Amino acid sequence: MIALRLKKVLPNIIHHNQTGYVEDRYIGETIRSIFDVMEFTDSKNIPGILIFIDFKKAFDSLEWHYLFSCLEAFNFGPNFINWVKMFYTNIQSCVINNGMASDYFTLERGVRQGDPLSPYLFILAVESLAISIRQNVDIKGIKIGNHEAKLLQ
């Protein structure tokens, strides 16, 4: 239920160039845009650097305090934030290997694999980083007409 509510508001919060996990957006557009930028810079002999970032173990590495601060920054209400906090407080897990379960251990970061809420929480956290990149005047994009391609997600 919470995932469905979050899914509905994401298109209003997440920048249009973030195509993953946002309804009515297609990640193929981002791939096409990357090729278009590369072709443009090659044809105009424009020097530049294209950086591709792949978050290693992305869902496992998201710090909860950062996630909660992102929810606050995007003006989610206290009730919604408290629901999310409830999902990520005092979580324990174990590892099953060859049918044998390990002792339980406390989790301290990450969003749950397979949980429908997880991709939405993750892209909210990534959007916060993306906003910082877009607003940083020292990070330049490639100017194509009146548009600057600075960040493609």
Predicted regions and their residues:
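Nucleotidyl polymerases of mobile genetic elements and RNA viruses
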Residues: 1-153
